[in-house]
UniProtKB/Swiss-Prot annotation:
GO terms for cellular component: outer membrane-bounded periplasmic space. This is Outer-membrane lipoprotein carrier protein. Gene3D superfamilies: Lipoprotein localisation LolA/LolB/LppX (2.50.20.10). Belongs to the LolA family. Monomer.
Length: 214
């Protein structure tokens, strides 16, 4: 009996220690993100399948600003645009001539990447964060939803000191999208309009905002 109690105690202690470490990791990641009031960068993208076979490469421009502002413009190989203006998230596919719009709060459920500009305590509580050291200069944080609500099952974000340098997305099919950032800087005052989206003429609009359903 004493041996069983000892084993259970060790398991409980290990579990509590692991939970505390993950909480500390989440706190550290949020502290790093809170120091980024805005960021503008170019990115290169590489997508591989579950067998590490290349599927696609691409490039574009990425920007974010607190609170809840996000800009993602894929320019190669096919253009697409994602803009979060603080209240709404707009997804524009020029080829399909279609715009999807949803609440920013829904964006976090659609992809944990939205956590980069989201600082709500209740939202972060839905995710587990684990820190891992990649090298002497780089530190990565793995983010996983505690309950899967989207096709993105894992996100990792990597820093060199306080600079965000790359992030990866893994979907439920096992495809890995890797994004490397370069030319990082703050968003300039005269660039603030990149977080505003004007709906183009002659496009279909799929309005998924929650207020539309009420």
């Amino acid at each position: 009996m004493n041996k069983r109690i000892t084993v259970l105690s060790l398991l409980l202690a290990t579990s509590l220690s692991s939970a505390a470490a993950m909480a500390d990791d989440a706190t550290e990641l949020r502290a790093k993100l809170s120091n980024i009031d805005s960021l503008h960068a170019t990115f290169s993208q590489q997508v591989t399948d579950i067998n590490s076979k290349p599927i696609q490469t691409g490039s574009g421009v990425f920007a974010l600003a607190y609170p809840n502002q996000f800009y993602w413009h894929l320019t190669q190989p096919d253009e697409s645009l994602i803009v979060a203006d603080g209240a709404n998230l707009w997804i524009y596919n020029p080829f399909a001539e279609e715009v999807t719009v949803m609440d920013v709060a829904q964006a976090v459920d659609a992809s944990p990447m939205a956590l980069l500009v989201h600082r709500d305590e209740a939202t972060w509580a839905k995710y587990s964060v684990t820190k891992r050291a990649v090298s002497g200069k780089s530190t990565c944080f793995d983010i996983q939803p505690k309950k899967l609500n989207s096709n993105v099952v894992a996100v990792s974000v990597c820093f060199e000191a306080s600079q965000l340098v790359k992030f990866n997305l893994t979907d439920e099919q096992g495809n890995l999208s890797q994004f490397a950032l370069t030319q990082q800087r703050k968003v300039k005052d005269n660039e603030a309009n990149i977080f505003k989206f004007a709906v183009p003429d002659n496009v279909d609009i799929d309005d998924q905002r929650l207020k539309q359903a009420n």
